[in-house]
Amino acid sequence: MNQIFANPLSLPGTAQERVSRAVDSLRQGQGVIVVDDEDRENEGDLIFAAETLTAEQMSRMIRDGSGIVCLILTDPDLDRLALPPMVAHNTSRNGTGFTVSIEAREGVTTGVSAADRVTTIRAAIDPASTADDLARPGHVFPLRAHADGLSARRGHTEATIALMRLAGLRPAGVLCEVMNPDGTMARLPTLIGYGQAHGLPIVSIEDLVAVGAR
């Protein structure tokens, strides 16, 4: 395990305690910050459950994050929506599973506003929705979680689905990387301070693996 996550001064409490706090926050309709290790992306992602996401929470992701808001989905939802990969041959460093970007066909204006993006996400996760309910391209970026979860890929994408399942929520989440005001990526301990300031518990991907989450 990378030292920054093994060190209790970095992330207070045990892995189980951190996971429990994150799960409780999601169940209450609030967000969490998920961090990976410095040998991977070394980033913290702000994550919310797709089914409880509000326009205010979306605004926070746009304002405090990279602006690239991603909707994490599993195979059944992506197949229902007939969303193909963004590219035929994925050569990205971490094999991130981007599909084509989407927009709700109804109920949005330009699709860029926080409210419009929430409308798009709600349309996508509606079990009754089909490919005809979405326009492509758009301003929401779906990501396909690996079918074998964290056992196959230890990414923020798979961590999002693992957290939703632990919380008893539908397997769909929304994430955006947290950034500093100067445009650089936020790292620990900045992420810890950000989480404390906004009441967002922090959990690491290693924590999720340690408690057996998939």
UniProtKB/Swiss-Prot annotation:
Pathway: Cofactor biosynthesis; riboflavin biosynthesis; 2-hydroxy-3-oxobutyl phosphate from D-ribulose 5-phosphate: step 1/1. It catalyses: D-ribulose 5-phosphate = (2S)-2-hydroxy-3-oxobutyl phosphate + formate + H(+). The record marks 139, 177 as: Essential for catalytic activity. Its cofactor is Mg(2+); Mn(2+). One of its GO terms (cellular component) is cytosol. D-ribulose 5-phosphate binds at residues 40-41, 45, 153-157, 177. InterPro entries: DHBP_synth_RibB-like_a/b_dom, DHBP_synthase_RibB. Its EC number is 4.1.99.12. It holds the Pfam family DHBP_synthase. It is an enzyme of class 4 (lyase). Mg(2+) 1 binds at residue 41. Belongs to the DHBP synthase family. Catalyzes the conversion of D-ribulose 5-phosphate to formate and 3,4-dihydroxy-2-butanone 4-phosphate. Homodimer. This is 3,4-dihydroxy-2-butanone 4-phosphate synthase. It comes from Rhodospirillum rubrum (strain ATCC 11170 / ATH 1.1.1 / DSM 467 / LMG 4362 / NCIMB 8255 / S1). The gene is ribB.
